[in-house]
Structure formats: C-alpha cells, structure tokens
Amino acid sequence: MSPFLYLVLLVLGLHATIHCASPEGKVTACHSSQPNATLYKMSSINADFAFNLYRRFTVETPDKNIFFSPVSISAALVMLSFGACCSTQTEIVETLGFNLTDTPMVEIQHGFQHLICSLNFPKKELELQIGNALFIGKHLKPLAKFLNDVKTLYETEVFSTDFSNISAAKQEINSHVEMQTKGKVVGLIQDLKPNTIMVLVNYIHFKAQWANPFDPSKTEDSSSFLIDKTTTVQVPMMHQMEQYYHLVDMELNCTVLQMDYSKNALALFVLPKEGQMESVEAAMSSKTLKKWNRLLQKGWVDLFVPKFSISATYDLGATLLKMGIQHAYSENADFSGLTEDNGLKLSNAAHKAVLHIGEKGTEAAAVPEVELSDQPENTFLHPIIQIDRSFMLLILERSTRSILFLGKVVNPTEA
C-alpha cells in the first residue's frame, strides 16, 4: 500500500474590532521584488479558480451555506507542486488556471511567494496572516531543495513527526492548529490513515474592524430572513445609515454593496433578486469583479445586514479529482521533487473555514457614537439595502486584489 500525503487547508476568518498589534510572523521586504502587473494577472487567475471551485460546491451541497478561502487553497496546492513532477505537477497548476506556456512554473511559484509575503506584511488595524506547516514522518527523507524552497519561499514551519503513533501525531498537529488559530479551532484532525507519512497544514487568520462600525443599540434582535419561498428564520439585524459604494447590476439582476474594513480589506455583499441566485453564480468571474469595481458609486444607503456566524468543512478530494487533479491521488503519482522514496501519493485534502460578522466582534471594544449631523435629513430619499435573503459574500485584500474568502449564506442561523 502506498504511503499517504495528507493536505489540510485550515481557515479561520473573523470579523472583529480594531486590533492594533502587528501580526505575528516574519516580515520580509517583498513589495519591490514583483511587478504589480504580475500580481494583478495572478489575482485574476486565482479569482477564476475561486469561482470554478465555488460552483463545484454549489453542485455538491445545493441550498447550503458555502464558505472557504480561495487564496488558502491555491497557495497550499502551489506549495504541494514544489514536490510534484511531470504530469502530477502539470495537473495541479493547470487546475488552478495557469497555462505553463504563458506562465512558467518558476514564475507561478515566485508569484505566490510574493503574494503570501504581501498578505503577511504588517498593517495597523488589520490582522492578516497566512501560514503553512509541514509535518514529516521521521522515516521520510525529503529532498534538501524541497525543504529549502518551502522554508525560504513560503516561510513554512517543518516538524519531524512520528506517524507510527497515530494518536500522538494527531495531538501534535491539532495542538499546533489550535495555537495558530488562537484557540478557535480545536481537534481539527479526527483520523489519520495508518500509513500517512506527511501532513501539510495551511491556515489563514483574519481580524479586522469595519471602517463604519454598527451601533449595537440599533441592532434588531429578531428579524426575518428568507431561506426559500416558504421558509424564514429569525436573525439579529444590524442597521445604519451610511455612505457606501454600491450598484444595481441590471444585467445580472443583483445589488452589490461594498463595505470597507478600516485598513486594506473590503467585503462585497452580492444580493440577487429572488430566484436569480443561480444565474448570478454562473456569471461570477474575474471580469465580473472588474466590471463592478468600475461601476460602484458612493452614496447614502439605509442598510440592514444580518449578524451571524457560519463555518464549513470540506473534503476536497473528490472535488479536486473532478477539476483535474488526478495523478496526485493515483498509484502513478510523481512526488520525486519531494523525496526519493517511491510510491508517495495524496490521500486527502481537507479545508475548514469559519466566519463571524458582527457590529464589533469583541465585547471589550467600543463602537463610536453615530453623530446625527453626519446623516442626511431626508432618509426616505435614499436606497434601502436589506440583506434579508440568500446572498454571496466576498472578502478581498486591496493591494493584491486577492479573494481571501468566498461564500454564500443561505441560512445565517446554521453556524
């Protein structure tokens, strides 16, 4: 039986209040080494992969909440490609949307190095960190080049792990995950195959403050949210009158609202008209995002947004197979760039994401009072955006235009 490589893609996404400390982790000078054009090219390719993966999830889990981190999944798969060769490597990068004729492998790998470095660069009032950890079996002999690449290019932590003791290995990995997510994710890995010899963990941690925080006293404790034509649930509904970038896309029959975080990140709420969700999902692409970015206009909005928490866990194995990554799971997998040992193949790719949207995120934080003089007198003249039915949500990092998180909220009461 072939030894297994286990890929874990862990995401912790939080909307919280202001956090002034700089993110932990190594800071490197990455902003001058990569042309902006390359980053924008990569962000477009990554966005199209994100929407392709999203559409797979809608087929596999229809009428369910969807939430995941595209940049986390892409970065982990590119890191895995460091150790892959021949068709195994080609399938991985082509599934991500790259054409090796147009974009050589070295450009892809260095592009992601710069992307991760840019995302990890400390930003006051925004805590954003993407990281990797590699747990390698004590008897596996990884190639020096592979270890050097993942350490220097991706700042990956590497641990020597005794996988002959499954219980101890799970404890070691879960303890590391719990520590990196500040205790938010406990017991991520419940089982490991007996012949597992390597586990790759990728995580992204995000905390930010709304640029225009909501006043908790204006949150309605119970408001109707439409799940389908006949079913509603009750959710807390936040409310404010504020200026936001927004638009009505007449072609796609949806309303788009941009809510900025205080520093270098933004959230896009996409609210289709009733019965139009599938057509909007089918049209989502990097070109759609660029169109909206051009057309968004700032103006006063009477805004109602649900307060909610959702999480999602995915076994990406079957999904990645359908998308084109097949050799990595087969007996013919070629990971000779990782080790000289024969027979290594990918056994599983797991992904977990968690999100909380609220007025302030932590009880200790204060929300500024809303000055009445800053609001328009004739509120009835301004559009009402009431997010009270299924919607899509995107969270993007501004400087790289990377989609940090992507999802659909069908039922905000299903945590």
Curated annotation (Swiss-Prot):
Residues glycosylated per entry: 36, 99, 116, 165, 253
Pfam families documented for this protein: Serpin (PF00079)
CDD domains listed in its UniProt record: serpinA7_TBG
Effect of residue 116 to N: Gary; severe thyroxine-binding globulin deficiency
Molecular function terms, GO-annotated: serine-type endopeptidase inhibitor activity
GO cellular component: extracellular exosome; extracellular region; extracellular space
Entry keywords, A to Z: Glycoprotein, Secreted, Signal
Coiled-coil residues: none
Keyword Translocase assigned: no
Family: Belongs to the serpin family.
Protein name (Swiss-Prot/TrEMBL): Thyroxine-binding globulin
Source species of the chain: Homo sapiens
Native organism taxonomy: Eukaryota, Metazoa, Chordata, Craniata, Vertebrata
Name of encoding gene: SERPINA7
